């Protein structure tokens, strides 16, 4: 097929990733919440973890008002604020009828939906435990050009690695904005731009994190850290 985004539904509310012309893996596929209720995005990701490209183990929701994608990925304590500037998270609930993009690991994988993912009262918080987890140390690196802003997140935890941590390191789905900032995997040369990167605390004073900025030639940008 010459359709860059294609696929079909299967019995049992599954979705098989279709072909992407000249793409090595399953490519980007457009899915949506098939339920008449909200859907628990975290549970959907957990159930289908092996079907995602490991650099993009997330759901990407397009923010039409601002013209960029927000992501839903593994929750990191202290960094799940859906109200932050471009490059931020979307939260953990996908409302009925809401579409989202996924990067399939290869052609033919199946993304499964089941009724246990349904959430009927979105006003209630998702309670994972009785205690509140301590926020991970880290920063939100912001770049600004004129009135345009973009952000990338870097966090630290002893369970993370300098290499890829699927679901915690989140690839960037870019819309080509006026200004954009991202990082790359710290321990090797990678071509995947990340909107969020998780690293170990040990050795944090010596690790070098590649940071990239896309903007108009000659533009003057301002950096800040939150």
Annotate each PLM feature:
Residues 2-226:
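Compositionally biased Ser/Thr/Gly- and acidic/asparagine-rich
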């Amino acid at each position: 097929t010459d359709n860059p985004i294609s696929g079909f539904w299967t019995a049992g509310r599954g979705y098989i990733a279709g072909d992407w012309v000249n793409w090595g893996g399953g490519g980007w596929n457009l899915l949506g919440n098939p339920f008449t209720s909200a859907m628990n995005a975290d549970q959907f990701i957990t159930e289908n973890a092996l079907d995602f490209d490991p650099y993009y183990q997330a759901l990407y929701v397009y923010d039409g008002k601002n013209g960029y994608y927000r992501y839903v990925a593994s929750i990191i304590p202290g960094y799940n604020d859906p109200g932050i500037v471009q490059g931020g998270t979307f939260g953990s609930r996908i409302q009925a009828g809401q579409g989202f993009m996924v990067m399939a690991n290869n052609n033919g994988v199946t993304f499964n939906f089941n009724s246990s993912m349904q959430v009927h009262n979105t006003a209630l918080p998702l309670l994972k435990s009785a205690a509140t987890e301590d926020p991970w140390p880290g920063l939100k690196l912001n770049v600004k050009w004129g009135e345009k802003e973009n952000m990338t997140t870097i966090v630290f935890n002893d369970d993370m690695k300098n290499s890829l941590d699927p679901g915690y390191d989140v690839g960037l789905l870019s819309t080509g904005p006026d200004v954009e900032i991202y990082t790359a995997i710290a321990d090797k040369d990678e071509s995947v731009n990340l909107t969020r990167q998780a690293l170990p605390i040990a050795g944090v004073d010596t690790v070098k994190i590649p940071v990239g900025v896309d903007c108009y030639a000659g533009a003057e940008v301002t950096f800040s850290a939150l």
